Curated annotation (Swiss-Prot):
Gene Ontology CC terms, in alphabetical order: cytoplasm
Predominant subcellular localization, coarse grouping: cytoplasm
Family annotation (Pfam families): D123
Binding site for ATP: K104, W107, A109, R111, R167, K168, W169, C170, E177, R179, R193, D233, D246, N248
Disordered, as annotated region: 48-73
Residue positions where Phosphoserine is found in the record: S60
Protein name (Swiss-Prot/TrEMBL): Translation initiation factor eIF2 assembly protein
Superkingdom to which the source organism belongs: Eukaryota
Gene: Cdc123
Subunit architecture: Interacts with the eIF2 complex gamma subunit EIF2S3 (via C-terminus); the interaction is direct. Interacts with the eIF2 complex alpha subunit EIF2S1. Interacts with the eIF2 complex beta subunit EIF2S2.
Job of this protein: ATP-dependent protein-folding chaperone for the eIF2 complex. Binds to the gamma subunit of the eIF2 complex which allows the subunit to assemble with the alpha and beta subunits.
Subcellular location: Cytoplasm
Length: 336
């Protein structure tokens, strides 16, 4: 994977070419002062939020108690920076897209920060909603600081013009999303995107799903993207129509889901792993999905919202911690 491959997967690089195949979006240049604010690792103070209501006369009885929590009357009040011009641009764009948007940077969306939002969703209606997600996201920080970390070439990093991408909010069903892997302009693999869950309809319709995705790829994407190796995400709606969601580089920076990158780069284990209906076709992609509830896994974003020890206990990944936890509970019961 080279740096130019990563650059070609920036939203603004591919959206003009495939606008008719995807969700309506608006791209706004990200001012330098906004970027600096998003990268500031100080206390999270979100711009654009209303001040909390002041205490009324009826609350005066709590004044003494509240005063005790103040270390120093001269303590500085944290204030959020304001970006009035940018805020106006963002709000106009949000309104033009129906009032709610899905935000992302050049490459990534703050999927790892959904837990911090009031609605536990990436649905945003204001700039402050976006700031809260962006400042809480490791994925966004990666876009800013290490976009070319897995690239093999030693050439200077391309100059990046950072952009805020606002996509019209659509209620997408996770079980209808798929990730597709293309090598040398050939579709070699398709994976269920939400691989942590079992969806009965995917197992029952996998031949039809695979055929729809192949037809979409051959008609709209094959030999038309900027590179011959790439990854693309699609959404198949209830009518069977396929929508393009995103492009990603063909390499370790992209989650391979139910495949491994060793399999995808060598293709050795993909031969013969075709759907039954396409068994005679040499170029049929391997199709993988979660086949039963037994193979359901924890969400990959779980670790971003909870302490690691909690995650290890809940998933059973650290046997020693689990044993210690059980011993602690037993001792507590004996003490009682």
């Amino acid at each position: 994977m080279k740096k130019e491959h990563v650059s070609h997967c920036q939203f603004s690089a591919w959206y003009p070419l495939f606008r008719s195949l995807t969700i309506k979006s608006v791209i706004l240049p990200l001012p330098q002062n906004v970027k600096d604010y998003l990268l500031d690792d100080g206390t999270l103070v979100v711009s654009g939020r209303e001040d909390p209501p002041t205490c009324s006369q009826s609350d005066s009885g709590n004044e003494a108690e509240e005063t005790q929590w103040s270390d120093d009357e001269s303590t500085a009040t944290l204030t959020a920076p304001e970006f009035p011009e940018f805020n106006t641009q963002v709000q106009e764009a949000i309104n033009s897209l129906g009032g709610s948007v899905f935000p992302k940077l050049n490459w990534s969306a703050p999927r790892d920060a959904y837990w911090i939002a009031m609605n536990s969703s990436l649905k945003c209606k204001t700039l402050s909603d976006i700031f809260l997600l962006f400042k809480s996201s490791d994925f966004i920080t990666h876009d800013f600081t290490q976009p070319f970390i897995h690239c093999t070439d030693d050439s200077p990093d391309p100059c990046i013009e950072y952009e805020l991408v606002l996509r019209k909010w659509c209620e997408l069903i996770p079980g209808a999303e798929f990730r597709c892997f293309v090598k040398e302009n050939k579709l070699i693999g398709i994976s269920q995107r939400d691989y942590t869950q079992y969806y009965d309809h995917i197992s029952k319709q996998k031949e039809e799903i695979c055929r729809c995705i192949q037809d979409f790829f051959k008609e709209h994407l094959q030999y038309k993207f900027l590179d011959e190796d790439f990854v693309f995400d699609i959404y198949r709606d209830s009518r069977g129509k396929v929508w393009l969601i995103d492009f990603n580089p063909f390499g370790e920076v992209t989650d391979s889901l139910l495949f491994t990158w060793e399999e995808l780069t060598s293709e050795n284990n993909l031969r013969g792993e075709v759907t039954e209906g396409d068994a005679q076709e040499q170029d049929s992609p391997a199709f993988r999905c979660t086949n039963s509830e037994v193979t359901v896994q924890p969400s990959p974003y779980l670790s971003f919202g909870l302490p690691k020890d909690f995650v290890d206990l809940s998933t059973g990944e650290d046997a020693h911690k689990l044993i210690d936890f059980l011993k602690l509970k037993r001792n507590e019961q004996e003490d009682d």
